[in-house]
Design a protein with these regions (language model features):
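Acidic two-metal-ion nuclease catalytic site recognized across multiple nuclease folds
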Residues: 2-3, 171-182, 196, 210-279
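Substrate-recognition/cap helix-loop segment adjacent to the acidic, metal-dependent catalytic center
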Residues: 121-148
Length: 279
């Protein structure tokens, strides 16, 4: 266990990527923050770049596959394109080749204790997809790192009976701010968790990489301040998928953690059997 007097230098990364096309999840905007996660007042280093190779105008076209011909057809232009391209052109120093960005990131990871994001499943895959497009190999599997997923942390520990009580006592117009995009169920995005933690019902994320990484670093520090032992024992180095049905069904935090632990044990046993088979 890391003591409060010690440092725990962590990278929180956020990636904005292409979608709904053959360029799905190729990252065009990569940013991360680095800070001592054990100290809410510790300074935050910030890094942000646009990926030169993935800013080409043709990459912003949303496409679909024609059922009759099997060919890909243009649908519309990504609504983010104009603002992203304008900012990139206005700030040429923020535009770097992919290889250079990954080189800096790899160096940062090597001197950090962990790396994670709110949705590690998404961001880690986007990192690998971007790297694979130019190097024909994954990025993360080739470097030593300790991952974590804030969505995993918050959905299992912060979304608990106190959270549901808080939501239920809100007036209707405020309660709506904690719903998913469909409006059918309670949401659990970083934006919604920031609303809950800060009691700011109408907070809206910019959905730009650096701003989101800053918010997510704040969420990490909040979580560790409340659930330090659980973070290091249960979540660090063990990111897991989150089932939205556990939020919908208001499963207790204790039950979610029991199921999560059981899943971990099953995976460990499966890995042990596979290793024995190989030997």
């Amino acid at each position: 266990m890391i003591k409060l007097s010690q440092k725990f230098d962590v990278i929180v990364i956020d990636i904005e990527a292409h979608m709904k096309s053959e360029h799905n999840r190729k990252p065009y905007h990569i940013a991360w923050t680095r800070s001592n996660a054990l100290d809410k007042t510790a300074p935050m280093e910030c890094y942000e770049w646009y990926v030169k190779e993935f800013l080409h105008p043709t990459m912003w076209k949303h496409t679909f596959t024609d059922k009759n011909t099997g060919e890909r057809r243009d649908w519309k232009i990504d609504s983010r394109a104009d603002s992203v391209m304008k900012r990139a052109m206005d700030n040429p120093s923020l535009v770097k080749p992919l290889a250079e960005i990954y080189e800096i990131l790899q160096m940062q990871i090597s001197v950090s204790d962990a790396i994670g994001s709110y949705n590690w499943n998404y961001d880690s895959k986007a990192l690998d997809i971007g790297y694979r497009a130019l190097n024909h190999t994954d990025f993360l599997s080739n470097i030593k790192h300790t991952p974590f997923c804030l969505l995993d942390c918050f959905a299992n520990k912060i979304v608990n009976k106190d959270y549901f009580k808080f939501i239920d006592e809100l007036p209707k117009y405020e309660k709506e701010q904690y719903k998913s995009k469909s409006g059918k169920n309670l949401g659990y995005s970083a934006e919604i968790m920031a609303r809950y933690v800060n009691r700011d019902h109408f907070y809206i994320e910019e959905h730009t990489a650096l701003n989101d990484a800053k918010i997510e670093m704040a969420l990490l520090k909040h979580f560790i301040s409340k659930q330090k032992k659980s973070f290091f024992d249960d979540f660090l180095g063990k990111p897991k998928y989150v089932s939205w049905t556990t939020i919908r069904d208001r499963v207790s935090s204790a039950e979610k953690m029991r199921k999560r632990e059981k899943k971990t044990r099953q995976e460990i046993e499966s890995e042990r059997i596979q290793l024995e088979f190989k030997l």
